[in-house]
Regions:
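Terminal targeting segments of Actinobacterial cell-envelope proteins
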Residues: 1-29, 532-534
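Extracellular, repeat-based ectodomains that mediate carbohydrate processing or recognition
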Residues: 29-38, 43-534
Length: 534
């Protein structure tokens, strides 16, 4: 008999097994978390980029009080001394202790040192001891504080009928500038444009740079080939090492050396190479005013990593357009500064756009090439007014300040105001200009005015802290053409950084957001390809 087959029992048989899912379904399910992760990364990236560009409030730079004179003679109508070319330095041990040196051109060649013990609120003049056996013609001073708070003052003594440098001297002060030691002779004759720089870490190390002339005529060098040199002291200015050449042989008309020392001990010297400019260098203008040299000049940075023994050079810019004629013995210096990270800034004026503007170049740490020039002054391009003679200072927090002469308020382009602008992003952008001077100065008052070459000095001066900056300049408001009186004036600004993220954090968010965005897009593309394959 055959077996009888009945209907299956209902409710007792298990459903078909689903332990094994098809590969297609696995791919579809796997693409979903990939897509979710990709979208998440893209959203995070967008947020990071938005946050990196955000700031709770913008930076502010505002004038504090009003400008005031620095030199004692400014308060006397009987003293018509022409103070100019200030160097302002701050004591790193006692920050309220400031010192400023100044050159005096008329009525007699001389120099001065003023010190402050209250952050620049008040000033007193310190007597400069005369070297024995020298003519009493102190001139062209410079000043620097060592890391231990010792103040060092350099100056030249003039000699002969031509009043040319006869010797270079250094005096020191261990009492915050109240008194100076007997001067020590450092260099001999024809040392021009002497500058001092102190190592910010090594307390006893000083550098001196200068232009060493072979021969001179009246307010001129007789030919090219006068090098920029350097010497070093490792004992606080008591003794000095053998000189070394800074400027390369290719730069035959190098002038106006400006030294600065970085935190790592690297020595930088920024100088001008005036190219084929015989008009100014060899006195072709015979001390008379007129159109400037028509050819280009160059800005050159020399760098030494072995305390001045050997040097390398880079050309910052070789297309500078001169703004005016000048006396080569007393040129206008370019300005150089270096921040704690080793970023180098250089600044000078150039008439590339038809009238003088302040330009800034920067060299990032480890970089081999300079940034493109950045126009600092916020005037309308080609407005017919001059902005010139910039001075740079870097605050401890990395903010960059630029001080300069500014004629934007004078359509005739003759009267100087003094402006300050700040950058919180390494020179990429600047705050609007703040006017420090309460009254304009006549740029036609100064030594050489009768010949059409008035001299307001070789530089401005400034020190910067995280919350403030103090600027000094040559002011002629008390002078008239008959007296040529010039004074030093000062003014301070208060600075508030933009509230928000530091530049380092902003960069990290910016680059990190970019990378996360790319990763998120890649994951989204992967998820899309998986679904299309199904």
């Amino acid at each position: 008999m055959g077996a009888q087959v009945g209907p299956p029992e209902t409710g007792t048989a298990p459903p078909p097994s689903t332990d094994s899912t098809s590969p297609e379904r696995q791919r579809r399910r796997g693409s979903l978390p990939v897509a979710v992760l990709g979208v998440s990364l893209v959203l995070v990236a967008i947020g990071a980029l938005l946050v990196s560009g955000s700031s709770d409030s913008p930076a502010t730079v505002r004038l504090v009080g009003h400008d005031q004179p620095v030199n004692e003679s400014a308060r006397s109508s009987q003293d018509i001394s022409a103070h100019n070319s200030p160097t302002l330095v701050r004591n790193p041990v006692q920050p309220a202790n400031l010192a400023v040196s100044s050159r005096i051109d008329t009525p007699f060649f001389s120099c001065a040192l003023h010190v402050s013990h209250d952050g620049g609120a008040t000033w007193s003049q310190t007597a400069i001891p005369a070297p024995k056996g020298e003519e009493a013609k102190c001139f062209a001073p410079d000043v620097a504080f060592s890391a231990d708070g010792t103040l060092h003052l350099s100056f030249v003594t003039l000699g002969g009928r031509g009043n040319v440098p006869h010797a270079v001297w250094v005096s020191n002060s261990n009492d915050n500038g109240r008194t100076l030691s007997p001067p020590v002779r450092v260099l001999g004759p024809l040392a021009f444009q002497v500058r001092l720089a102190a190592d910010p870490v090594a307390p006893k190390r000083l550098y001196m740079t200068w232009l060493q002339a072979a021969d001179v005529g009246t307010l001129k060098f007789t030919g090219p080939g006068n090098p920029i040199n350097v010497t070093r002291s490792d004992d606080g200015g008591v003794t000095w090492q053998k000189r070394a050449r800074v400027s390369g042989a290719a730069h035959e008309r190098a002038i106006a050396p400006s030294p600065v020392v970085g935190d790592d001990g690297t020595l930088y010297v920024l100088y001008l190479d005036v190219g084929q400019d015989r008009l100014d260098y060899e006195g072709g203008h015979q001390g008379k005013g007129g159109p400037p040299y028509a050819g280009p000049s160059s800005l050159v940075l020399a760098r030494s990593r072995d305390h001045g023994a050997t040097w390398g050079e880079s050309v910052v810019d070789d297309r500078l357009v001169p703004m005016k004629r000048f006396l080569v013995f007393l040129p206008e210096y370019p300005s150089v500064a270096v921040d704690h990270a080793g970023r180098v800034y250089a600044s000078y004026q150039s008439s590339n756009l038809g009238d003088p503007d302040v330009w800034l170049w920067s060299l990032a740490p480890g970089a081999s090439s300079w940034s493109a020039p950045k126009r600092v002054n916020d005037t309308r391009p080609r407005d017919g007014t001059a902005q010139y003679l910039p001075k740079l200072a870097v605050a401890p927090d990395g903010r960059l300040d630029v001080l300069y002469y500014d004629r934007r308020a004078d359509p005739e382009n003759l009267r100087n105001q003094v402006s300050l602008q700040s950058s919180f992003d390494h020179g990429k952008s600047f705050t609007p200009a703040v006017t420090l001077s309460s009254r304009a100065s006549d740029s036609r008052i100064g030594f050489g005015a009768k010949e059409g070459l008035p001299d307001l000095g070789s530089r401005l001066a400034m020190v910067s802290s995280d919350r403030a900056a103090l600027g000094l300049w040559t002011d002629t408001r008390a002078g008239v053409p008959e007296t040529q009186k010039q004074d030093l004036a000062e003014a301070a600004v208060a600075v508030t950084a933009p509230e928000g993220l530091s530049s380092g954090t902003q960069d990290a968010l910016r680059y990190g957001g970019f990378i996360l965005g790319l990763a998120g897009l890649a994951l989204l593309a992967l998820a899309l390809n998986r679904r299309r394959a199904d």
